[in-house]
């Protein structure tokens, strides 16, 4: 394989570009898929940039991954269209694989899409795609956040870092929701007897929440009646003593009155 063919395998064609898109912006965008050597936007005779560009990667495996990750992303409201460069081995594999799928009987319009053809590439490309397939949506969001931030502030395009700030709030909310649901479920699953035991463990709960009759409800009827009879017995003795005292006082008075008459 010659040097030109090797460079073609590491290059992507990016079309449908807005006139505001610059080489620095494309460098920052495609750097999310792997190390980028250079980005070239050709110009016409008048010096105006054309609506397509070439992105050259350092590693060949970054080419199919960049197509799967960034194809269709909108820049300034216009979705970009990524294709393999003509003459590369990726483009020839895409053409050769599209015909067997068509003759098998799969008439789906997405049978020849880049995402389907990438799955049938070399084992190294398949391994990379499988390793990133689970986090593809997160990486696409991170790429757009990074690009929008660069476009908003107009900063210099250097070595990019994935913006992970969009992931932490969802993780915290999930943890918070899980903690609330688990705590509420624990409160619902706790038996009522255990809650009563915890309430009765406080030394003053009984005095606060129960009246005198409820506090003495555990006493036996015999003991309660015995105490009540004792009080009545004392009352009867007191009444009997006062009655005898009144009789003696009355009899004494009557005796003196009788003695005085005689």
UniProtKB/Swiss-Prot annotation:
The modification Phosphoserine is found at residues 133-134, 201. One of its GO terms (biological process) is meiotic cell cycle. It comes from Bos taurus (Bovine). This is RNA-binding protein 7. Residues 10-87 form the RRM domain. Its main location: nucleus. The modification Omega-N-methylarginine is found at residue 149. The modification N-acetylglycine is found at residue 2. It comes from the Eukaryota. Keywords: Acetylation, Meiosis, Methylation, Nucleus, Phosphoprotein, RNA-binding. The gene is RBM7.
